Amino acid sequence: MATMIIRHKVEVYAKWKRGYDEADWLRKQHGITYASVHREESNPNDIIVVHQFRDMKGAKDFVNAAPPIMGEIGVIGSPEIWFSEDVEQVTYS
């Protein structure tokens, strides 16, 4: 598995979130198996998204396919993106 963490600023969180939700088809198309959305504590328009993929190819293909949609839903500037290979995952209750 692979994880991608992306951080970017948006014009208005509510507009971005609607567009993000409507692009569910794109996430499914590229094999995203898990997603979580986070906001910077002091700036709700500073977004961090975590996506897990079946493999690194899906993650990189997704990043290449997403830019047109990102502009439409209000992403400002270039995002910061990190890729990682999943080594271990533990759930605590």
For every predicted segment, state its role.
Residues 17-36, 52-85:
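An amphipathic, aromatic/His-enriched active-site/gating alpha helix that lines ligand/cofactor pockets
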Residues 1-4:
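Short structural boundary motif marking the start of a folded domain
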Residues 9-19:
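Short, surface-exposed ligand-recognition loops at beta-strand->loop->(often short) alpha-helix junctions
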Residues 85-93:
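Short, low-order "capping/linker" segments at domain edges
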